[in-house]
Design a protein with these regions (language model features):
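Carbohydrate-active catalytic/glycan-binding domains of CAZyme proteins
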Residues: 1-318
Length: 318
């Protein structure tokens, strides 16, 4: 058995993924285009069906005024917690209406999503992390670093206990927790708690051909974070591989305990490198080494074709 990357072809950059039971859900950036933030569903991580958009009503978010080419909705993150799907993203509008970081939510990803709940924090590439002690954290990229702030959600319920509305307050100061390994533009942060460690996965090098993934970890969510000695842990830079610009990764564990990453990349058709399908969504397997650090893809590289030797659990069971 094999599969061929990309798993979602065409203009679908900045993928983020979550799993609920047997189901995987994925979202992408949509920039100035409406409807915004496409939502996909899959049972096997290979075959994906688009099931809707997070921004589907003009009154949700203004994209017509002050939103030039290549700005708008940046880098959404999707997370699921206690029956609610959350998508956090940034509307970059250069001072236009509805600019800033926001959350939309739903209990049914096939239906409509809420109006945006704006968050008074700067930067781009916002992400949510629900800790096992009930606290919620925001990470974002700002001023050439990755920062964290604590959030507090308040909910309203109907008579059946279903959430009907929510608000979100920032309840701590911002703290820079990592500046990366020295690459340009540290961004795209995601936090995970695995075996007692807080792992901070980010992108560096810019979203062109020097793109790379780096990772750090800490026993305390606020740091200090130690950098992986093998950073960057994932990049196709300076190789002859057909997929270029790999980065902006989110990771997920399947029901068999196997780990996978989704990332963006592009497929140039000429040299100097030019690509006409934009940044696409790719899938890569990963494992953890004896020291507790991820080994992503083929020793940090993304191949176009993955064979059965790379496929574990989820696919070998079929």
């Amino acid at each position: 058995m094999e599969y061929i990357n990309p798993i979602i072809s065409g203009f679908y950059p900045d993928p983020s993924i979550c799993r609920v039971g047997d189901d995987f859900y994925l979202v992408n950036s949509s920039f100035e285009y409406f409807p915004g933030i496409p939502v996909f569903h899959s049972k096997d991580l290979i075959n994906w069906e688009q099931i809707g958009h997070c921004i589907s009503r003009p009154e949700q978010l203004t994209l017509r005024q002050g939103v030039p080419n290549c700005v708008g909705i940046y880098a959404p993150t999707i997370r699921y917690h206690e029956g609610i799907f959350y998508v956090i993203s940034t509307n970059v509008a250069y001072g236009g209406k509805d600019e800033g970081n926001f959350i939309v939510w739903t209990d049914n990803p096939y239906g409509e999503w809420s109006d945006p709940v704006f968050i008074d924090l700067p930067g781009i590439d916002s992400s949510l992390f629900f800790d096992d002690d009930g606290r919620v954290y925001y990470t974002g990229a700002f001023d050439n670093g990755i920062f964290i702030s604590e959030l507090k959600f308040s909910y309203k319920y109907d008579e059946n206990g279903r959430v009907t509305d929510m608000s979100c307050d920032v309840v701590s100061d911002r703290k820079v927790i990592w500046n990366g390994t020295g690459g340009n533009d540290p961004e795209g942060p995601h936090l995970y708690k695995i075996n007692g460690w807080y792992y901070l996965l980010i992108s560096e090098g810019g979203t062109e051909f020097c793109h790379m993934i780096t990772i750090a970890r800490s026993r305390d969510i606020l740091g200090e974070y130690e950098s992986c000695p093998r950073n960057p842990v994932f990049s196709n830079r300076s190789t002859s591989l057909p997929i270029k610009g790999t980065g902006h990764m989110d990771i997920v564990c399947d029901k068999f305990g196997d780990w996978w990453g989704v990332c963006l990349g592009n497929r140039p058709i000429t040299y100097p490198f030019k690509h006409n399908l934009g940044r696409e969504t790719f899938l890569v397997p990963m494992v953890w080494d004896e020291g507790g650090w991820p080994v992503i893809g083929r020793d940090g590289l993304l191949d176009e074709k993955l064979t059965e030797n790379c496929l574990v659990g989820l696919f070998k069971s079929r």
